[in-house]
UniProtKB/Swiss-Prot annotation:
It is a multi-pass membrane protein. It comes from Escherichia coli O157:H7. This is UPF0056 inner membrane protein MarC. GO terms for cellular component: plasma membrane. Its main location: membrane.
Length: 221
């Protein structure tokens, strides 16, 4: 049981900086301004369900996609590292705030004409939460843990769905309490936390690239 908690904790530490619910909260506040409370709650729930589904598909079907297109693990790690590092750089040095982006503005204009517009899948679930960096991380991690003997087989079966479920629950809770979060930490606080997460993502991306290169060198020797 202790191994299960360790695996879940490790998974959350890896995924949460990539999923970054706080940036999704900032985007949600910009897009859902014209929605009533019930509609905001519905969008929050649907976004969380979509995120869970995307992560499950990436974990269990990602290897099949890799085999179909002939993608190697080192190649995936290097590509995932580049994506993660790029996302981290954008979070460290943002050009536009999420709520001021053209996508958010156009979505806000839609909401003025159609208050019940669906923003749960795009952009809240994808690409804001379960974006390319998150998906690459999940596929790479799935391939790694299946080859590793660190955890028992039953832990590797039970932990991933629980990790994805907890990420979805954290996102749902964050979106449900989006107004309170913004009032508590303020825009400056969210920006500071986002930049810290961006730095962590850059470090993780560089480590991904290093691991991929080392694996290529080891394979060719």
């Amino acid at each position: 049981m202790l191994d299960l908690f360790k695996a879940i904790g490790l998974g959350l530490v890896v995924l949460l900086p990539l999923a970054n619910p706080l940036t999704t909260v900032a985007l949600f506040l910009g897009l859902a301004g014209n929605m009533n409370g019930a509609e905001r709650n519905r969008q929050s729930l649907m976004a969380s369900v979509y995120v869970f589904a995307i992560m499950m598909v990436a974990y269990y079907a990602g290897q099949l996609v890799m085999d179909t297109f002939g993608i190697s693990i080192p190649g995936l790690r290097i590509a995932g590292g580049l994506i993660v590092a790029f996302i981290g750089f954008r979070m460290l040095f943002p050009q536009q705030k999420a709520i001021d982006s053209p996508e958010a503005k156009s979505k806000s204009e839609e909401l003025e004409d159609e208050p019940s517009a669906n923003i749960a899948f795009v952009p809240l679930a994808m690409p804001s939460t379960a974006g390319p960096g998150t998906i690459a991380m999940i596929i790479s991690s799935a391939s790694t843990v299946r080859q590793s003997s660190t955890f028992a087989d039953w832990v590797l079966m039970v932990a991933p769905p629980l990790i994805f479920f907890l990420v979805a629950v954290i996102l749902w809770g964050s979106l449900r309490s989006s107004g309170a979060i913004m009032r508590l930490v303020g825009k400056g606080g969210i920006e500071a936390i986002s930049r810290l997460m961006g730095f962590l993502l850059v470090c993780m991306g560089v480590q991904f690239i290093i691991n991929g290169i080392l694996e290529i060198i080891k394979t060719n020797h």
